Amino acid sequence: MSEGLNVGIVVFPGSNCDRDVAYVTREILQWPTQLLWHEETDLGDYDLIVLPGGFSFGDYLRCGAIARFSPIMAAVKDHAAAGKWVLGICNGFQILTEAKLLPGALVRNRDLHFICDRVHLRLEAKERPWLRAYGDKTVIRLPIAHGEGCYYADATTLAELEANRQVLFRYADAQGNVTPESNPNGSLNNIAGICNAAGNVLGMMPHPERAADPALSHSPSEHTLDGLQLFQSLLLASAFA
């Protein structure tokens, strides 16, 4: 387990970030990685299943609303129930909420525009395994690209998420201050990413796979590899499980 995780990346019709994630896990981290067509029904012995970004089924009806009925999703639910890792990025986060693997919903951005930018995120609940590799770091910077990334949940669900420390990423400024101005899409409580109560399923709107290689950074800085550390966190968590 300490040599790497066995990764499966689900490909839905309309996915467009699957190969970006595969580049990180297969080429940079040297982890065994397979692309899995959405009609698969057996996830075998994968440690990590990733639902990548994109526009699954053209975002018809609602983002992720059709993808949740794909045959592979029953296996993803079983994988999660077994305590194994599941990561949903952007459209993958939307699919996880539609499939009820995570609470709440992702709705239209506050200004109704598609947003493509880099944002600062304050790390919350650092005891969670997904954040183990970040050490003393409290603020990271990741790209976002979405039109329906506004996180919404009812008051009771929000209170439970906060009380259970299921919020892992919160939109903030460069100093880690959570403000209305640092919220790009109107998400309640500035929420950018949450996990399930057990902690093995994570959904996030920012794209960690786009901040994992110095060669792809337009301005190398302390935040260049902020996304890579998310994946490295799982290896650390698995090695010491």
Curated annotation (Swiss-Prot):
Q: What is its main location?
A: cytoplasm
Pfam families (alphabetical): GATase_5
Question: Which GO molecular function annotations are given, in alphabetical order?
Answer: ATP binding; glutaminase activity; phosphoribosylformylglycinamidine synthase activity
Nucleotide-binding in keyword set: yes
Q: Name one GO biological process term.
A: 'de novo' IMP biosynthetic process
Q: Does the keyword Hydrolase apply?
A: yes
Question: What Enzyme Commission number(s) does the record list for this chain?
Answer: 6.3.5.3, 3.5.1.2
Reactions catalysed, semicolon-separated, are: N(2)-formyl-N(1)-(5-phospho-beta-D-ribosyl)glycinamide + L-glutamine + ATP + H2O = 2-formamido-N(1)-(5-O-phospho-beta-D-ribosyl)acetamidine + L-glutamate + ADP + phosphate + H(+); L-glutamine + H2O = L-glutamate + NH4(+)
By its UniProt entry, which InterPro entries does this protein fall under?
A: Class_I_gatase-like, PRibForGlyAmidine_synth_PurQ
Pathway assignment reads:
Purine metabolism; IMP biosynthesis via de novo pathway; 5-amino-1-(5-phospho-D-ribosyl)imidazole from N(2)-formyl-N(1)-(5-phospho-D-ribosyl)glycinamide: step 1/2
An example of a Gene Ontology cellular component annotation for this protein is: cytoplasm
Alphabetized UniProt keyword annotations: ATP-binding, Cytoplasm, Glutamine amidotransferase, Hydrolase, Ligase, Nucleotide-binding, Purine biosynthesis
Q: Which residues form the Glutamine amidotransferase type-1 domain?
A: 6-241
> Where does it live in the cell?
Cytoplasm
Q: Which SMART domains match?
A: GATase_5
What PROSITE patterns has UniProt attached to this entry? GATASE_TYPE_1
The cross-references to CDD domains, in alphabetical order and at most eight, read:
GATase1_FGAR_AT (cd01740)
List of catalytic residues: C90 (nucleophile), H207, E209
Q: Which domain of life is it from?
A: Bacteria
The subunit field of the Swiss-Prot or TrEMBL record says: Part of the FGAM synthase complex composed of 1 PurL, 1 PurQ and 2 PurS subunits.
Q: What does this protein do?
A: Part of the phosphoribosylformylglycinamidine synthase complex involved in the purines biosynthetic pathway. Catalyzes the ATP-dependent conversion of formylglycinamide ribonucleotide (FGAR) and glutamine to yield formylglycinamidine ribonucleotide (FGAM) and glutamate. The FGAM synthase complex is composed of three subunits. PurQ produces an ammonia molecule by converting glutamine to glutamate. PurL transfers the ammonia molecule to FGAR to form FGAM in an ATP-dependent manner.
Q: Which PANTHER family match?
A: PHOSPHORIBOSYLFORMYLGLYCINAMIDINE SYNTHASE SUBUNIT PURQ (PTHR47552:SF1)
Q: What protein does this entry describe?
A: Phosphoribosylformylglycinamidine synthase subunit PurQ
